[in-house]
Amino acid sequence: MNTFTSNSSDLTTTATETSSFSTLYLLSTLQAFVAITLVMLLKKLMTDPNKKKPYLPPGPTGWPIIGMIPTMLKSRPVFRWLHSIMKQLNTEIACVKLGNTHVITVTCPKIAREILKQQDALFASRPLTYAQKILSNGYKTCVITPFGDQFKKMRKVVMTELVCPARHRWLHQKRSEENDHLTAWVYNMVKNSGSVDFRFMTRHYCGNAIKKLMFGTRTFSKNTAPDGGPTVEDVEHMEAMFEALGFTFAFCISDYLPMLTGLDLNGHEKIMRESSAIMDKYHDPIIDERIKMWREGKRTQIEDFLDIFISIKDEQGNPLLTADEIKPTIKELVMAAPDNPSNAVEWAMAEMVNKPEILRKAMEEIDRVVGKERLVQESDIPKLNYVKAILREAFRLHPVAAFNLPHVALSDTTVAGYHIPKGSQVLLSRYGLGRNPKVWADPLCFKPERHLNECSEVTLTENDLRFISFSTGKRGCAAPALGTALTTMMLARLLQGFTWKLPENETRVELMESSHDMFLAKPLVMVGDLRLPEHLYPTVK
């Protein structure tokens, strides 16, 4: 009995203590909740009631999760659809949500400068896409690799070892050889048939030049074509390169809905794998053999970009770069060379043949600066201001692509008063910047004179981002000097050495863009004739 009474008493005491503890815990929780609520209330009261969180840039309302992807799939090419949205909304900055990604499009130079000058470091990354992963061998390169240690490493190598002013001067002879080869090749085409396909010719000149700088040779074939033109191997390589360029940032559905990667719903993945494999087929044997030669001591002199990549050492004296880094970086740089210069020269020639007065002025300038007793050289470029004004106008009015490569926001920010969330992909519109009527009078008219300034030398770069020739900022073009040399020398040699007219029964070029990209709808074909003494034309070597 005493035992029962004692146990009952203990249970009563325990229950009382438990009840007291629960009450105290509940009170403590309530006190904490009240305190947090008061703090939040005070913070809200202290906040400026008129200060609102900035809105996203204007844009269409999409579906949950998938955003505007259904509309995107029906609206090809996507770049025209995005520009039509901006036109409908009458805005110079817009936001279109694709999956969970905010795609921000910009056509205003002032906003572009805010992004690439004032907030450049914040927009220094690239998106993760299937195409990039394939081309960069798992993000080991410079141009298309997202921001991080690997990007910094490769960017430093490219900027300090490959495209610095000293290297540019050092490789002058190789560029000069390709300028002469272009003149010899065009001479042979003019003498044999008179007809020249400018798209084919300009692309392969640029391809020859970058191959010479990269590998020390202009061709992937053991045998060269007698007239100086590309071989079957070179043509296959060039076609694969341009196919890859067309699909590197092509609004692939799996880039916005990653769970669809592998299904290849729009065929982009197969195209990228095949085109990348073709380029690797030509690049990799040369790279592997060269690495072996350096390792065995059979090659000790640096003669081209590939030698530079292989010979760079780290602080311990070991090779800084692996083959897995060298191969995709070379592929990336080779791809970066041909499209922009070749497109500008083809459009410039098309515009000039429709406006003979511009063509006449350009040839008069070359004759005045250079004469007809020698060939134009890179040293003449500073004085060829009208020729460069023509090229600036071609870059402005006829950009090689509708948008620059995407810039990814590394954190939340505000641009032009609008909220830009972390991870947003910002697309600067080459098309919209160059044709912005608030910036350019009569923007659809080809007027080289608008770029002339008596007080200064004309350059192809555009630092104020009123148009984009060679992009700027941390992710800008690494080699504007090389781009300027290739583009200007190509046009100058074609104008100095030859007169040009349209084929028989054609009176003007139809200046129409392709239905799926920004290239001229039909490749420009013209008939040439010699305008210099024959002894000045180089021979194919």
UniProtKB/Swiss-Prot annotation:
<keyword id="KW-0472">Membrane</keyword>
<dbReference type="InterPro" id="IPR001128">
    <property type="entry name" value="Cyt_P450"/>
</dbReference>
<dbReference type="InterPro" id="IPR036396">
    <property type="entry name" value="Cyt_P450_sf"/>
</dbReference>
<feature type="binding site" description="axial binding residue">
    <location>
        <position position="477"/>
    </location>
    <ligand>
        <name>heme</name>
    </ligand>
</feature>
<keyword id="KW-1133">Transmembrane helix</keyword>
<comment type="similarity">
    <text>Belongs to the cytochrome P450 family.</text>
</comment>
<dbReference type="GO" id="GO:0010120">
    <property type="term" value="P:camalexin biosynthetic process"/>
</dbReference>
<protein>
    <recommendedName>
        <fullName>Tryptophan N-monooxygenase 1</fullName>
        <ecNumber>1.14.14.156</ecNumber>
    </recommendedName>
</protein>
<dbReference type="GO" id="GO:0005506">
    <property type="term" value="F:iron ion binding"/>
</dbReference>
<comment type="function">
    <text>Converts tryptophan to indole-3-acetaldoxime, a precursor for tryptophan-derived glucosinolates and indole-3-acetic acid (IAA). Involved in the biosynthetic pathway to 4-hydroxyindole-3-carbonyl nitrile (4-OH-ICN), a cyanogenic metabolite required for inducible pathogen defense.</text>
</comment>
<keyword id="KW-0503">Monooxygenase</keyword>
<dbReference type="GO" id="GO:0009682">
    <property type="term" value="P:induced systemic resistance"/>
</dbReference>
<keyword id="KW-0812">Transmembrane</keyword>
<dbReference type="InterPro" id="IPR017972">
    <property type="entry name" value="Cyt_P450_CS"/>
</dbReference>
<dbReference type="GO" id="GO:0020037">
    <property type="term" value="F:heme binding"/>
</dbReference>
<dbReference type="GO" id="GO:0042742">
    <property type="term" value="P:defense response to bacterium"/>
</dbReference>
<dbReference type="Pfam" id="PF00067">
    <property type="entry name" value="p450"/>
</dbReference>
<dbReference type="GO" id="GO:0009625">
    <property type="term" value="P:response to insect"/>
</dbReference>
<dbReference type="GO" id="GO:0006952">
    <property type="term" value="P:defense response"/>
</dbReference>
<feature type="transmembrane region" description="Helical">
    <location>
        <begin position="21"/>
        <end position="41"/>
    </location>
</feature>
<dbReference type="GO" id="GO:0002229">
    <property type="term" value="P:defense response to oomycetes"/>
</dbReference>
<dbReference type="GO" id="GO:0009684">
    <property type="term" value="P:indoleacetic acid biosynthetic process"/>
</dbReference>
<keyword id="KW-0408">Iron</keyword>
<keyword id="KW-0479">Metal-binding</keyword>
<dbReference type="GO" id="GO:0006569">
    <property type="term" value="P:L-tryptophan catabolic process"/>
</dbReference>
<dbReference type="GO" id="GO:0052544">
    <property type="term" value="P:defense response by callose deposition in cell wall"/>
</dbReference>
<keyword id="KW-0521">NADP</keyword>
<keyword id="KW-0349">Heme</keyword>
<dbReference type="GO" id="GO:0016020">
    <property type="term" value="C:membrane"/>
</dbReference>
<dbReference type="GO" id="GO:0009617">
    <property type="term" value="P:response to bacterium"/>
</dbReference>
<keyword id="KW-0560">Oxidoreductase</keyword>
<dbReference type="GO" id="GO:0009414">
    <property type="term" value="P:response to water deprivation"/>
</dbReference>
<dbReference type="GO" id="GO:0090489">
    <property type="term" value="F:tryptophan N-monooxygenase activity"/>
</dbReference>
<dbReference type="InterPro" id="IPR002401">
    <property type="entry name" value="Cyt_P450_E_grp-I"/>
</dbReference>
